[in-house]
Each structure stands twice: as C-alpha cells, then as structure tokens.
C-alpha cells in the first residue's frame, strides 16, 4: 500500500491513516506520548474491562501497577521450576504421540502449554490442556474461533453488547468462540472465589500470588475499588487469549524456521548440547537467556513473524499533529504496523529472510531500536518477560531432546492472515524421529 502510493502516510478510512515510519512510531508510542488508545477499536474487542483495553491513562496506570508485581523478573525466575515441569510434561506427551507413530500438530501443543502456564498465573492452576486426550482441546478451538471473528468485533463494536444481551442459546451458535471462552473464564473465576471464601490456598507456586490475588488485594498505597466479577472475567479472557496465542505462535514459528534451515539447526543444536547440564540436569533459565544463538533465533523469529501484526490505533490529541507534511486534526485515528517496522529494508537487510546472525554482529545494537515485537511505552505487553521465559524454555528442551523433521507442511501452510493475532492458512506438523535423551527411535506416521 505504501509502495503503491509512494508515501509513508496513507489514508485508510474516513478518519484513519496508516503511517509506515519507525521514527513517528517511537513518538506515538513513547511513555509520555499524548496519543491515547482508539476508543472505537479497543471498546470493541470484547474484553473492555481488561488492562489491554483500558483507555483512561490513570485507570490503566493503576491496573498495571496492581498486576506488575506478579510479572517481575524475580517472580518469573522463581516460577521457573514449575515452568520447566510444564514444558517437560508437554515434551513427554509429544514423545508419547511419536511412540504411537503420530505426527505432532504444533498448534495443539504449543497453545495447550501456554494456556496451562497463563492459567497458573491467572487462576492459580494450570488448565490441564496438554494432557487432554482430544485431538484439539475445546478451549483451543474456542480461542481460534474468537480470533477468526475478531474483525467483526472491530468493525461492529455493538456486537459485544448484543452478544451479552441475547439468549445464550442464540449467542453460542452465532459467536461460539467468544461465548464459550467467557463461560470458561467465568467458571475459573467462580472456582477461584469459592476457594478463597472457603479459605483454601489457591496457589503456592507464585511468589506474589495470582493475577486475581493482586487485583483483589491492592496495597494500601493504591486507591482502587474492589473489582466487579465482570472485571475479573474480562481479565481472565484477555490473559488466556493474549498470554497463549502470541507465545505459542512464536514457539511454532521458531520450530518451523529452525527445521527449515539445516545450518541454523546445526548451530542451535551445538550450542544447546554444550549447555545440556543447564537444560537436562539442573535447569537454569538464567543460563538459557544468555545463550547467544538461541537468543538470536528468538529475536529473528519475532521479527519475521510479529505475533500482533494488526495495526495498533492511537488517537491524535487536541492540538493535532503534522506528519510528513500532512496536518492531522484531533480525533484522527493513527495506526502503525509492527510487522512493517520489522520488515523495513532500510534497517533489516533482506527483511523477508531468516537470518539469526543479524543479531550477533556489530550492528545488532543499532537494530534493537527497531525491534518492537511487544510494542513499547507504558502500554507495551505486560507479560513480555514471562513470554520470553516460556519461549526459551520450550525451544531449549524440544531441540535438545528431539530430532525432528517437518511433516506434510509447506511454505504455503505457513502463510498467515491478520485477525489482530495471526492465523495461519495451514497446519504446521512435525515428526519426532528420535528422543536424543533416551535414545528411543520412532517409526514414521
């Protein structure tokens, strides 16, 4: 679009423009930026009371201050034994599938794993999806359905009110993903509240308590009303969706890209083998986070396949703004695409090519300012540190333990469509050839 019109700024709607300029993006999304989130967009996403959809700056600051202690680096580090256990369980289940001569649908296992993790952080218990026997757990289907319908919500914001007002028997047929996701979040919140009322400890694995603990027990220095159940339910839906899809998508993509590039697989395998005692024997997430080539693979995957590829809308403030010679009056919706920033050839040579080495050279520091997979500023992804720990742990264990190959998966299968989060056109499958830790070899599906 920008190439067609030979302009960094293009009008995409009656009151909306898209700007493809990383420098403008930096100003728009800076912590002290006067550009607020677009009310039209964020009020339509179906979870209006969740942190990601709060538009009032003061209320957002309060909510982020309440939740941030549960996602600090030291908290996530203390959770690493539990994360390691969940990832190892996922690897064991995948190995069991291979033992039955079955291929592995990576979406099924990566999403199940990330839902289990975020369920532990939100409700105080993993959701148990990895160990479900269904070919695709119902909750994962709900998440996929919800994502598929996202553009309807975006363009018709009244749908949210309508879906919650009409009988469930109708709304469940019309918007099954959203309705069933909300029902599951409601059930989990009610179970949590009942446990609290009965005096049962909800979670003994999290240093600061669950997200619901943090919302219901604010520190004295923060003036905050007790959240209504609808707020807890919205946060539950938002954390399950945002905390599973983006992270699982990155795990899938990294697996595909490494298997698709044998030289990359060889380098990664060598690095992981040298660090095996920190992976297999005494698990050390601090050591994994320092592995240069693993880090480069993760960064390049997030650059190439930006999880939130949909343009992020902000509203021009009262005085208006001049961008590339065009005056935009107050109220204009200004959008930026993280995907386009990550694929800008002025900063990333051969931007469509998978080149982890670009993050290892002397110019890597210069690229960091254009690396924004979790956005930036005060509205950046609150769960970024947790996501990195999940991705590193998963990739380290899976590529240390298994010899794998792609199974009935083509480049066309990996093409994607924008549903705010990304939906793939096909299915990414792998075949586990051998368990390197046990020496067990598996027959082909």
UniProtKB/Swiss-Prot annotation:
GO MF terms on file?
heme binding; iron ion binding; monooxygenase activity; oxidoreductase activity, acting on paired donors, with incorporation or reduction of molecular oxygen
What this protein needs as a cofactor is:
heme
| EC number per UniProt | 1.-.-.-
Q: Which CDD domains match?
A: CYP58-like
Which one Pfam family would you cite for this protein?
Answer: p450
Which pathway does it take part in?
Secondary metabolite biosynthesis; Alkaloid biosynthesis; Mycotoxin biosynthesis
Q: Which UniProt keywords apply?
A: Heme, Iron, Metal-binding, Monooxygenase, Oxidoreductase
Function, as annotated, reads: Cytochrome P450 monooxygenase; part of the gene cluster that mediates the biosynthesis of penigequinolones, potent insecticidal alkaloids that contain a highly modified 10-carbon prenyl group. The first stage is catalyzed by the nonribosomal peptide synthetase penN that condenses anthranilic acid and O-methyl-L-tyrosine to produce 4'-methoxycyclopeptin. 4'-methoxycyclopeptin is then converted to 4'-methoxydehydrocyclopeptin by the ketoglutarate-dependent dioxygenase penM through dehydrogenation to form a double bond between C-alpha and C-beta of the O-methyltyrosine side chain.
The name under which this protein is listed is Cytochrome P450 monooxygenase penB
Source organism of this protein record = Penicillium thymicola
Gene name? penB
